[in-house]
A protein has these predicted regions:
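Nucleotide and nucleotide-moiety/phosphate-recognizing core
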Residues: 1-138, 143-164, 191
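Glycine-rich phosphate/pyrophosphate-binding loop and the adjoining helix
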Residues: 157-193
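Acidic/polar hotspots within intrinsically disordered regions
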Residues: 196-199
Length: 200
């Protein structure tokens, strides 16, 4: 999606673009990362597996489908390009939820009384259900949820484990580009400090 007059995934800070920062973060926490988007636009992501939507112009639901289609994993974490504040603690938390609820097709967090479908776990077995929704032009991102088994992670549980306000912050909710770049830079520096054993 677009904001600040351009694709928000391409906003730059710390010598990299937002999508590159998110990709590196995911690549450090998962065995394989698939980027769904334009190969030409994201060609700077060296070593990344980039796949273009199988169903064009069908929105985020088509992105979920494409990611699952090219994945070889039973369980898949899917996120948007506008949530750079997800971290390894959250990823490990979701992996533990998979261990506890291995049969659930969807493991999704709830925040502010809404499910967050682009920070969730999806089983590859959902492919047929999602494809049917796309072919029927039911393009709401959660169109297949009612016919799928899911574990909803309560907001209370999330709050006990995370700084939920920051974790759930989306780029699209920030109005000022400079504010966004400053926030991203701060997060980047904190993570670099943690990597080298340096505290704030």
């Amino acid at each position: 999606s677009r904001r600040f007059g351009s694709d928000k995934a391409l906003i730059s800070f710390a010598g990299m673009k937002l999508i590159e920062y998110i990709y590196r973060n995911l690549d450090q926490n998962f065995k394989k990362v698939i980027v769904v988007g334009s190969k030409a636009e994201y060609s700077f992501l060296k070593g990344a597996e980039i796949r273009e939507d199988i169903f064009q112009n069908k929105g985020p639901l088509a992105g979920i489908y494409t990611g699952l289609y090219f994945s070889k994993s039973r369980y898949n974490f899917i996120c948007g390009c506008d949530m750079p504040f997800l971290n390894s603690q959250y990823f490990n938390f979701l992996k533990e939820e998979i261990r506890i609820h291995p049969k659930k097709e969807i493991i999704v967090p709830r925040y502010n009384n809404y499910l967050e479908p682009l920070a969730a776990i999806y089983q590859q077995s959902l492919l047929t259900k999602i494809k049917d929704e796309i072919l029927n032009d039911n393009l709401k991102i959660k169109s297949f949820y009612n016919n799928s088994s899911k574990k909803v992670i309560s907001e209370e549980l999330l709050k006990r484990n995370f700084d939920l306000e920051k974790l759930s912050k989306k780029i699209g909710r920030l109005v000022d580009k400079k504010e966004l770049q400053n926030l991203l830079m701060k997060t980047y520096l904190i993570r670099k400090g943690e990597e080298y054993g340096i505290n704030e």
